[in-house]
């Protein structure tokens, strides 16, 4: 049989076109399906995140939210209310008749500050190729103002957008956000000035939202008060963190590091407290090369955290060669701590909300404390401890140190049946110590003697000798030291029971 080559070639071309057409349709269908699935995933992520907001604190609420979804993208608009809710009224205790009210009581019945509302708008582009990149979605965020709010924003930020953020969302739900706050400035002639160089922040979160990393940079801040001449200047601040928040933000673990180039405060005319004139000048304070490190862990259900703050500086004409402060908490029962912290954060009373002011807030907080007291007592079984582990200052080759820790030790189930104060007196533990150079005490006395607040410096050696004779302090070379310890219901001063000979 004779085969027509032309007809065969036409059939081949048609077959290839059909295959290509089918392939193109499949790709289009797959892309469309991927886009639709990406859009669904983004929307569900938004809903989950917004549902979590009111669970964090009583001071933040989602009051308006809309999500206009299209095929290739969506627009989300969310309004948050910051501050006390309008319906957060507290039970007000009985008050005196109007004739007996004084000014202080009238101030206590003042209502809380009006809440502030902030609106964010997110422009979302669905994947799988969102905004020219392979991602489930990209999101561009900005603040939204009404006419009045826009005018105020322009006074501070100029024509720049106050806040912008670009987020790339991965297919597993992880996201990376680059956020920028524009430089801001405000100056009122004869009053105050404010100049901030803005901030940049990158946040990375995994799909389960349990692991967070961030990097923050703030170039600087300059604030001044023309009336008092007071100024506050902050140099460049950088910070980074790597945290696990699978147990919630309250129990986030990991490490945070920060460095502040400088922090300077000066008040040459005082702080404005003196009536009818300038106040007494406050010595200028300059802190430099400040390093901050914080770490937190959870092991065997117990939470521990430490924080260290150190650097160099100058107060007036006195150079500080080194300062360091370390504090922390240990053996904090994680579940109990979270329950207490969540209840506190969710309490309108604890956040100062509701009518009735201070008295009503105190009454409501007492009710809250009574409810949480059993949980607080139960945490004592784990021998919790908090304190200032070390505060050290070096000046002119001399070093001063103070420290203290407070906690509970040896608590039994039987102990927990006792009232809270009885438990504290029996099982509470307190340790504190101080070491100061004698030279510093003499310098402090010389400064205070000018205003008659302290004895003259030449009397200081005699006063220290009297204190040593009575057992209140010890002399160790050029230093004066003191130690106090409370445990098992007894108090010791410098290693001796209080009331013993020499005390």
Q: Predicted segment positions?
A:
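Glycine-rich, small/hydroxylated-residue low-complexity segments
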Residues: 20-22, 29-503
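Gram-negative bacterial Sec-dependent N-terminal signal peptides
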Residues: 1-34
